[in-house]
A protein has these predicted regions:
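N-terminal glycine-rich FAD/FM-binding segment characteristic of electron-transfer flavoproteins
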Residues: 1-190
């Protein structure tokens, strides 16, 4: 429809045509230039601070919206309900991995901890694939990107895809019986 390239997950704006975005699971940064007249971008969560507040109100611009061309249709809506904070917006995230051994251990160990911290629950892909938790708990390159104030990883070895989804957390605490686990390379405490 717009006939322009989309630039995803930007973490910095160099100028009106140049943006920085992660690549290779967040292990390198690419500087991308777009000469398209319209820019379509997505922003990586927590990459930018809050805009300064002002006493001035923003201008309101009226636009004419064309009629729906009928190209796509909503076939349903479903809201998930939880007493816990939403994973991508939580200040504290507690994630479990395959090292927990079972879905029962995940629930028994992590749920009381998450309640005490008012934290969201997350998981590694291995824990999701093992059936410990549903797919919407997954943190990582193929899951959700999080950057909380505190990220606690329990029983997570730290595959590069998982690290790409949580390494921007302010403080990372890792608990793993393998002292050589990659999670310790990004952990502040372990």
């Amino acid at each position: 429809l717009l006939d322009v390239a989309q630039i995803s997950e930007i973490v910095a704006v160099v100028d009106g045509n140049t943006f920085v975005r992660p690549m290779y699971a967040g292990n390198a940064m690419a500087t991308v230039r777009s000469s398209d007249p319209i820019k379509v971008i997505t922003v990586r969560t927590t990459s930018f601070g809050a805009a300064p507040t002002s006493s001035e109100s923003a201008s309101i611009e009226s636009v004419n919206v064309p009629a729906d061309p009928g190209i796509s249709h909503v076939i349903g809506q479903e809201s998930s309900k939880s007493d816990r904070p939403e994973l991508t917006a939580a200040r504290v995230v507690i994630s479990g991995g395959r090292g927990l051994g079972s879905a029962e251990n995940y629930r028994k160990l992590l749920e009381p901890l998450a309640t005490a911290f008012n934290a969201a629950l997350g998981a590694s892909r291995a824990a999701v694939d093992a059936g410990y938790v549903p797919n919407d708990y997954q943190v990582g390159q193929t899951g959700k990107i999080v950057a909380p104030d505190l990220y606690i990883a329990i029983g997570i070895s730290g595959a590069i895809q998982h690290l790409a989804g949580m390494k921007e957390s302010k403080v990372i605490v890792a608990i793993n019986k393998d002292p050589e686990a990659p999670i310790f390379q990004v952990a502040d405490y372990g």
